Curated annotation (Swiss-Prot):
Disruption phenotype: Embryos show defects in branchial arch and ceratohyal development. It is found in: Nucleus; Cytoplasm. Part of the 55LCC heterohexameric ATPase complex which is chromatin-associated and promotes replisome proteostasis to maintain replication fork progression and genome stability. Required for replication fork progression, sister chromatid cohesion, and chromosome stability. The ATPase activity is specifically enhanced by replication fork DNA and is coupled to cysteine protease-dependent cleavage of replisome substrates in response to replication fork damage. GO terms for cellular component: cytoplasm; nucleus. Keywords: Cytoplasm, Developmental protein, Nucleus, Ribosome biogenesis. This is AFG2-interacting ribosome maturation factor. It comes from Danio rerio (Zebrafish). InterPro entries: CA109-like.
Amino acid sequence: MPGSALLSLQQELRRGFEALKAAKDTFDGGHAECQELVSSLGNLAPQLKALKQVQISETPLSGFPCLQQRLHYKLSLAVDALLAKLAEKMAALQKVWDAFAQQVFTVVQLYEKNTDALDISVCVSRSAVCPSVSDMLEWLQDADRYYRLQLMQSRLLLQTLTPTDLTSMETAPNRWRSVRSARQEERIADALCQVSIFLETE
């Protein structure tokens, strides 16, 4: 039943791209929110450095007991609070990616299960309103790999951020920006544009 297999695959492809749209929106917003938090961490680093270098005992503030330790404790709490918020954001992004990755897996599994019933010429044919099945499968898998890599790199970056490593904290905002690939983001946006009419048809 080649026709039935193709219709089922197209239905799963639609679900896959709907999941991709949701993932893209969430990752775009989540990355921007995390960028603000990471920038705040970067701003705390110079304060911690300055506190480490200053001798409060030699300033007019010397009359306040344990001031240096209390200021350090307060700044460290601020770092911990920002890291906790970042961990929450990453957990939310992980859930979104998990849902998208599961849908991509379902699509690929369905395609592989019905390979014998799907004519290769049908899978590679495209029209002005509908990309080919092979193109759409490739786009979904590329997006899946990209978001997985983005999550992994983001987690690795966050693991380097502690109040004891001020250099990593100070350079974190620029490193966070580099986690995203403008080229990959453009490819995902282009893929969603190309499937827009396909998604509206049943």
